[in-house]
């Protein structure tokens, strides 16, 4: 069975090999989805779903999505905003995707979205529903 993951940092380098000195072949933003090809101790070989790039990311830069078939697009960050994880705040870059599960909750449940971000999401959803 295929496994999938999601990037949980603002910006992540996709490396050609499983080490820090290898070439950066692409970058992924917060919320980008990928297929897990080969998990390892410190690095995981992945394939980005949006453009098909294959490379390695560090294991602490992503999290596994358990119910991949149950998620759908939530919104696209149209301005830079911050979210809080259990440990720190990170900035969501413009263009980052936020996904939801069937319960309409953001997939990244370990993150707390600020009131400002939630209001933008809600206003965007209501304007889309009216169309």
Q: Predicted regions span which residues?
A:
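SH3-family beta-barrel domains
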Residues: 1-18, 27-28, 37-40, 47-49, ...
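Intrinsically disordered, low-complexity polar regions and short flexible loop motifs
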Residues: 21
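A basic, amphipathic helix-loop patch mediating RNA/tRNA/ribosome contacts
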Residues: 24
